[in-house]
């Protein structure tokens, strides 16, 4: 993952994809990742160099327009774009997110991923229906992370989805009421 980000720094999309498809994708396929997931993984993470300091070309352009400090803008971009760093791993470990699998798996994995991202984002920001204290943030983060653990990792991972759904419903109900 780090190698994809480093090799993608300062390059256009097509160049990043060609370079990473030659250097990184074959290794991922060799260890058992499906070819589609491997190529989505490298493309997605290769483009994350646009918002990842120290290069963060897109963030630095935005900083110059806003007359803001470039590195601070880069770190803020990373914080706001945290899902973009997680999604490629979800592609690798949950192929149903790339429409490879049964419709039941697709529904379960997509709904868990959406709810997990939603809960983690609320926990990171510190606001849902109202301002969250440190315990509320921790509860939202924990529920979201449990939902983001792919069920394909093993039979134990299915239980993390159940616990994440129950905990997520509980913290949302607690915050809304």
Located regions from the model:
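Alpha-helical transmembrane segments of multi-pass membrane transport proteins
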Residues: 1-177
């Amino acid at each position: 993952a780090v190698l994809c980000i480093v090799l993608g720094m300062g390059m256009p999309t097509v160049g990043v994809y060609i370079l990473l498809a030659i250097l990184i994708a074959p290794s991922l396929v060799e260890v058992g990742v499906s070819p589609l997931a491997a190529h989505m993984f490298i493309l997605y993470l290769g483009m994350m160099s646009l918002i990842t300091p120290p290069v963060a070309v897109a963030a630095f352009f935005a900083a110059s327009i806003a007359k803001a400090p470039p590195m601070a803008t880069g770190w803020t971009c990373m914080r706001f774009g945290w899902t973009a760093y997680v999604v490629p791993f979800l592609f690798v470990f949950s192929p149903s997110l790339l429409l490879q699998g049964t419709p039941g798996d697709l529904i379960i994995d997509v709904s868990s991923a959406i709810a997990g991202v939603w809960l983690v984002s609320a926990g990171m920001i510190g606001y849902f229906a109202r301002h969250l204290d440190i315990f509320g943030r921790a509860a939202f983060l924990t529920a979201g992370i449990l939902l983001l653990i792919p069920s394909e990792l093993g039979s134990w991972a299915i239980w993390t989805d159940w616990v994440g759904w129950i905990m997520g419903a509980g913290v949302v109900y607690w915050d809304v009421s």
